Amino acid sequence: MKKKITWVAGLTIAAVLGVSGCGKNEAQTEAVQTESQTVSVETQAETETETQGETEMVIPEGKARSFLTGEIVDESLNERRPVALMINNVTEALPQSGIGQADILYEAVVEGKITRMMAVFQDYETLEKVGPIRSARHYYLDFAHDEEAIYGHFGWSIYAQNRIQSEGIKTLQLMAGGLNSDYYRSDDRVAPHNVYMTGEQIVHAIGTFGVDTAMPENYEGRLNFNNTDTEPAGGADAATVDISMSSSPHFEYDADQGVYMKSQYGEPQIDDVTGDQLSFENIIIQYAPYTCIDTNADCQDIALTGSGKGMYISDGKAVDITWEKENLDTDHTHYLTEDGSALKINPGKSYIAVIPEDYEVTLSK
């Protein structure tokens, strides 16, 4: 099935002046500007199916296959819930810290067309510094639930607050003037772009809020992994990938390392702790309907149940996929090949962009 992807030229300037964006709990002014050019790409996607006779993976005693990366980890890590932290992603927050250690990095649009990220960590105790941490948006609760993760945030929108309180969701609710031992502010940036945590503080906050750390009984993970690195069958060339979000995510495939190197805002995205550029084995694009639910603050809602289209990118190739999710409370998002089979992704770190249906993804050779 052919899919034509067209990037329509445009200029977007968005500025938001409010309190916690949606909900007016926290003062902020954020402005972004993006410019795009018209590009047309045609892809021919073929179904990727499980190879017959694939060598069975032997997992050593005391080890397990990570639910997040498909890599071999200590069994104890798979027995506890990961932690998902809301990450500030405006230029004043750059470079971010610790997110290069994330197993999965989500990015989605919030008010004013800006984006925020959610970094998911399985081995969070070892974090030296992570942040800047920012306020919650209600649909990020669903992203965290997809990974069975404990959600951490500094502040919240009114919609996130209502949902957390009405549904009794236990999160790491770091609030200004609250539990100072669970976070700290750096002195090299101005608020609200200077809130951070350490691995030790994350562990302390989990205890403070009494969050259950045990994975659901018999949980097998929502992602399906190849046993070894496998190029997507019949994929279109994807040596570079550009997504028309305001942060201008740009990926370049490094064939020697077998990973995509990530840039944004026209510069390599660097982890301030390590000095390394962010890299991912997998890129997953999920198109979903966005709706403005507060015109004054441009607050967004995302329809994350039902089904929709998407794209899986790895090893320099891209294929069309679909996604489906029956309900927010008990189901997880499932990625499928075009014939309805469960998508298998490569072992390693993943970047997941949940974007409006009219946003464009541009691939090049």
Residue positions per predicted region:
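Processing junctions and N-termini across compartments
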Residues: 13-16
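Bacterial signal peptide processing site
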Residues: 23-25
